[in-house]
């Protein structure tokens, strides 16, 4: 949560605020310092999403009621959308970009369907579910989009092998500079 807060300070306070102020933009040294601070904040914050994906998979595996889990995530996605749009896009509602909880919800629903089709021994249906979930995230313009859904599904597929989760997660999110660091905790021995 702390890394997410750090990321949001960069996105909202710096990118949507300070870096747009004319007086700051006209002072090259100050602008460069604030822009570099923003970059650092955003790099630190990029660790958050992969951790949330891992925790979503763990929650899915351990919850007693997956439907209630999905419903709560859906409600939280809805409640979070207006503050997200105000903070990131500067308007009450913006259909162009949806918050990260919609990505997590799509990933959760995909896990539910893949699990159902796994029990029915229908691997083709599982692949189709993953593809459709990725397309849905892309079409809805969710935060992290299809890549986020893919990451969730990879963590779910390799749920019984931490090292494979680490490798799959780091490779899937290698385009995010600091995101692979998110998986180092998975390599630590458990007691």
Where are the language model's segments positioned?
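Short, solvent-exposed aromatic-acidic interface loops
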Residues: 173-175
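Membrane-cytosol interface segments of multi-pass membrane proteins
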Residues: 1-136, 141-153, 164-168
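Interfacial segments of multi-pass membrane proteins
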Residues: 155-159
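Active-site rim beta-loop-alpha module in soluble metabolic enzymes
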Residues: 178-182
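Conserved small/polar residues in nucleotide/adenosyl-binding loops
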Residues: 184-190
């Amino acid at each position: 949560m702390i890394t997410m807060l750090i990321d949001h300070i960069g996105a909202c306070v710096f990118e949507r605020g300070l870096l747009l102020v004319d007086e700051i933009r006209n002072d090259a040294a100050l602008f460069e310092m604030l822009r570099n601070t923003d970059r650092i904040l955003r790099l630190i914050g990029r660790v958050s999403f992969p951790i949330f994906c891992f925790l979503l998979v763990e929650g899915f595996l351990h919850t007693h009621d997956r439907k209630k889990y999905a419903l709560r995530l859906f409600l939280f996605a809805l409640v979070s959308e207006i503050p997200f749009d105000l903070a990131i896009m500067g308007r009450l509602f913006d259909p162009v970009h949806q918050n990260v909880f919609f990505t997590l919800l799509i990933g959760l629903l995909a896990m539910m369907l893949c699990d159902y089709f796994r029990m029915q021994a229908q691997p083709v249906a599982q692949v189709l579910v993953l593809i459709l979930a990725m397309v849905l995230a892309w079409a809805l313009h969710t935060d992290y989009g299809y890549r986020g859904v893919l990451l969730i599904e990879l963590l779910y597929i390799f749920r019984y092998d931490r090292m494979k989760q680490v490798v799959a997660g780091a490779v899937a999110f290698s385009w995010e500079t600091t995101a692979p660091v998110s998986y180092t905790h998975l390599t630590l021995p458990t007691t």
